[in-house]
Amino acid sequence: VEEALEKIKKKRGCINISDLAAELGYNQSYLDRLFYAATGMSMKKFSTIVRMQSAIRYLQEDKTDEVYEKLGYYDQSYFIREFRKYTGMTPRQWAKKSQKRIV
């Protein structure tokens, strides 16, 4: 489980869970059960959290329209929905709000 955690963090959450399980020599559902038992969340949920934390960092430096591609999202509207679930606002709203705090 520690190795799975580290690999997800290293890839900024941009990782295929079934490929990760195979790489670690586990069945995906078995590894996900182990992961859930150790962390209290699924690997997909953890991966999404890592991606959203990366998005927040990228939004401080990059244009909002570029961030979703850097994080491996193919659909910008899906990224916006995920970001809104995580932060309560769109990436653009978050970027504007964080710029006001910096200035």
Residues covered by each model-derived region:
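DNA-binding recognition helix and immediately preceding turn/loop
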Residues: 1-44, 62-71
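Terminal helix-turn-helix DNA-binding modules in bacterial transcription factors
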Residues: 38-74, 97-103
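…primarily DNA-binding HTH/wHTH and HhH modules…
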Residues: 82-103
